Amino acid sequence: MSITKKPKGKNILICYHLLFLIFLFSCSKAPTLFHVKGHKKVLDDITIIIQESGLQTNLGIKVVELESDETIYEWNAQALFNPASNNKLYTCIAALAILDSNHTFSTSVYQDTAALYLVGGGDPHLTLEQLDTMARTISDTMKLHLGRDYWFQNNRVRMRTIDRAKKLNYLILDDSILDDVPYGPGWMWDEGSWWYAAQISALSINENCVDFYVTPGITGQPVLIQTNPVTDFISITNQSKTVNDTANFKELKIERDWKKQTNSFTITGNVMDTASTDTFQRNVHDPTLYSGTVFAEMLQTRGININHVIKAPLSPGAIKLAEHRSRPVNHALTEFMKRSENLTAELLVKHIGAVFYDTVGTWNNGLLAIKLFLHDTVGIDTNTFRLSDGSGVSRYNYSSPEHFIKLLTWAYNDKVIRDQFLSTFPIGGWDSTLDDRMKNEDSTVKIIAKTGTLSGVSCLSGYIFTTRGDPLAFSILMNGYVNEAKPFRNLQDRIVSALTDIKL
């Protein structure tokens, strides 16, 4: 590979670093992208760490001291990478800025003459318990509004009470606040029934998944399966077996027939008879209808029989009977960032579009609103990167370490955003996606960062508060490897660890 642009600087060691890194981490054919700079000690330390790892991948790094805005390390910082879930950093900051921290999501139930309406508001964390509470409210309301029939019999007025709930023929589902496109641009077609690939709908419950509780049965017999919710919306074929030894042991699989877009699940494989109960989450096809079916079943247990569940807009004359409002969006963002929830990310993007443009929320208008914010407020040149979804699942996303450092620096310097934004991050060695990474015995050190993982992609961006109290923003993006991600995560952790003790 020929490099036509020579590295600047008088230090011969920097030239060595550049030649070494070009050899080890060939990131692009564009020669202008190869650029390394920073403090000599940091350059030495990180170069040694990278060399000792023996790993080969496309790599971009940038580290900035936030109080001085000084770059203390940079390698290939303007090159574009698929950021995976580091994309959620854009979504999180935009949600705080555009929706404001007190914004809530509403799910409502209405009634007209012969129908109930369940209206979704894009709540990413609506639970089965909250839906059941609304069903109980509807049941109680119906009992307070009983109808009465009067007639004459033997010259006396007779009266009987009629439960009007029994006359309800339809439960109508309105998810029209957002469009009905279930998958993001650039999502892989074969993600299947995994939790992280749940379809997107304005009417979502239980993360658009069914929980499967798996317990060993009698040896030689199928394992015991319970689900939450218990619903006729799905069917289960249980071909599994409880075993007492590991000979010919087959891993348990719970698979939905997603190719045919059904909600038929097949369970195969083995469970040891000594195993504890385990929980599996699998997504469903058509989450709007799933939510409606489960709600109708909840109503039925309370004596309200629904004959048909269909999708249609809310009738203008319908009367609101019940409403659930979510916690403020800043609470949703903490759970979203720490658990890296893809469904929440995409619902936020579409909801931002609906709020910003006062129309049906879509990926197009939501992402446009976010990019306008990033360009006009954060100062990112949105012509230099590609934002295709809110979660980072899309293979069309491209960002650089430079983009993330601008974002992280702006958020840190914004007095309104900073504390709320920083509180959403996983904490190194403490919780969620970083609970077993970057453990540091020095209590003065704090590392908060967002991970990003796809096949061949491992990224880490966030903040370091060093032993001296210096705040750093960093972004490490890695693309283009074919083996497991763990060695590359370990390399990221070593780089971050070296940065915690730097003396500027």
Label each region the model flagged.
Residues I72-E74, H324, V349-L504:
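Small-residue-rich helix-loop
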Residues F25-S26:
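C-terminal motif of bacterial Sec signal peptides marking the signal peptidase cleavage site
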Residues E74-A94, I98:
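Short active-site loop at a secondary-structure junction
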